[in-house]
């Protein structure tokens, strides 16, 4: 195994190892966001505001599909990380074999569900008639090739589960650049329309998947299963499926709530849809360090769970929380002053109504980012500890809250109700996750071990 690329999360100082592991994930996430942002910028500049709104109207559905595949990949990676922490390489190979089989089956299921329900779902979301056709063209391309997204997330999740977050980075950077080039070529030269933005994204993700597999085969072949490892192990398949579906469903529940919320946004017209789209893209970028630190905590907690180091899990939890809160405070101040410029740039518009509403969304929601930072850390730590139900409970709180806002608040509060919806729900979710995490036996044990240690 390539030790130079693999970060040791079980031994040594926590802060350097956590940052070394998290930084490549951060860069990977940045370039992953560039897939979507390139679509927004290029579509907005070359196809116009109506096409931009068509892409924006599918954001929640896109997040639902991609979030599910990413969640499944990361969830199964948690199981592999636990075996890696225990240095059980035979079990790792058996787990990898099982993830490939399960990933292929889930890809087929998601694709069939998409084919059957995509157009009715867009209609249910009150997608404006003038952009409905373009929205369907864009998102149907993503759904058709959902297996590509599954493949990449499974391979990348495998590398990250063993502490190798650097390997996939170079592949993803290359693919992001290819995505931008293809976007420009398909739209400006071939004039293929809005669906070509989805095609460019799929081709780019496919390149990432192929390069990830090639790297694993050449550099860490000990992770690849042989034919003998493709065997039925009920307990292993159940563990992988439960953990993968738990994280996939958690992402899906969040996205379903976003889909419901998007239905309210769509009723405000194309200008508000464009404002919301631009603001959400900016939000996704500025939250990347927080989501990266919390995602790193999942692997960190899982590996140290396998190594039986509860004290180290608690130390990592404290360090991760401080890092995440610090970034959240910085972003809150930054967005308060820079939101109008950023929204105008990303939406490719100087429309005062659009810029005002997009800026208001960012300025209000960012005030709650410190709370969101703890929410993400607590939830990912619970997932790393193998908890499946408690993180799901927080997602159901979010879903119920968004339904309540759509039914009771937004009809009379207007777009300001949309803006306040998620921040207020974050507060309730964080309270539930706090008590769930700090009542966990391993966290209590870790705190007791640290309390008995003599400070050096």
Where are these regions (language model features)?
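Short alpha-helical transmembrane segments in multi-pass integral membrane proteins
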Residues: 1-22, 80-145, 191-245, 301-368, ...
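Residue-level signal for short hydrophobic patches within transmembrane helices
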Residues: 11, 15-34, 38, 61-68, ...
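Transmembrane alpha-helix boundary and packing residues in multipass membrane permease domains
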Residues: 25, 29, 41, 78, ...
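Helix-terminus/linker motif at the lipid-water interface of multi-pass membrane proteins
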Residues: 30, 34-53, 122-129, 185-192, ...
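Interfacial/gating helices of multi-pass transporter permease domains
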Residues: 43-63, 129-134, 194-195, 236-243, ...
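Small-residue-rich hydrophobic transmembrane alpha-helices
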Residues: 52-112, 149-168, 262, 276-339, ...
